[in-house]
Amino acid sequence: MEKPLRIGIIAGELSGDTLGEGFIKAVKERYPNAEFVGIGGPKMIAQGCESLFDMEELAVMGLVEVLGRLPRLLKVKAELVKYFTQNPPDVFVGIDAPDFNLRLELDLKQAGIKTVHYVSPSVWAWRQKRIFKIEAATNLVLAFLPFEKAFYDKFNVPCEFIGHTLADAIPLQSEQAPARDLLGLEQDKKWLAVLPGSRGSELKMLSQPFIETCKLLHQKYPGLGFVVALVNQKRREQFEQAWKEHAPELDFKLVDDTARNVITASDAVMLASGTVALECMLLKRPMVVGYRVNTFTAFLAKRLLKTKYVSLPNILADDELVKEYLQDDCTPDNLFNEVSRLLESDNKPMLDKFTEMHHWIRKDADQQAANAVLKLIEK
């Protein structure tokens, strides 16, 4: 009797748990008895993945936090190396969490285990020399976006473009009215979605310019509604504080809901750069990007960033489809002028291009990831 396929797999945070779940399902369609072991969250565990450690162990952000947890992280890594070298899987798949996974993948690859890194780190954008570390640690990288594969190809590093799971999850057309009902927003007025980011540092920098932009918009369009998506109670309190300070007279509808519903319900979107810009593109809503970071980070970014643009829709199109106001340009006046333009125009060229790009990256990523990994095992 043939022994079942064994796949080592590690996800370091919730987004990785979702990717792992889809990947496991797709592999099991072809190999129902396949075994998965490593570190996963609730979704992967529900698919039958055996988790050797709690995923929370890896979900640390920020330099100070990581340093505090370093001894524990090193111990977990050492135990995983020992486990996988004593019980070698047919392949190891590290999902995202590059700081942890790439180091582990390097050790496993040196021990003769095939390794895959799922979700390319942003090497194309900054610290491009990391590509040599990635090459040393992996047999294959799975990339969400076509320009990522083009970058790896330039360095002859094996990479497969699998499409983006968000492009699979979001329908080609998204209905505004049901989203408004869901959020309790009036149907007969225009709404601007205000998305000041999900991290404390982002809200600290962006709440004030975004709120002051809304102040200017309210003077010009008294009937315009403002709906704000906030990821948790901490971010809500942070935004409320800024609201009280800068524009207590304005009426913001605060929503503890995903950005996706808030974007879908809106007529235009003012957002912090990040994955949310890609989501907004896939939902076909006109947007403007505003972003500020502290002076030191800005200084580093200027020297290190290798891309013309910061938002994914522009990087993907290699064109300024979406206005980006960064640092000193991220002012209420600039944002106000662009939001006004978006509200008064039909934005057809922008939205048509969004639809075209949705098709580019909609490839059934779960299935593509499974195919690429299984092909590597069979090599």
UniProtKB/Swiss-Prot annotation:
Pfam family name, one: LpxB
Superkingdom classification of source: Bacteria
One cellular component (GO) term of this entry: membrane
Keyword tags: Glycosyltransferase, Lipid A biosynthesis, Lipid biosynthesis, Lipid metabolism, Transferase
Pathway per the UniProt entry: Bacterial outer membrane biogenesis; LPS lipid A biosynthesis
EC number of this enzyme: 2.4.1.182
GO terms for biological process, alphabetical: lipid A biosynthetic process
Protein family according to the UniProt entry: Belongs to the LpxB family.
Protein name: Lipid-A-disaccharide synthase
Taxonomic classification: Bacteria, Pseudomonadati, Pseudomonadota, Gammaproteobacteria, Vibrionales
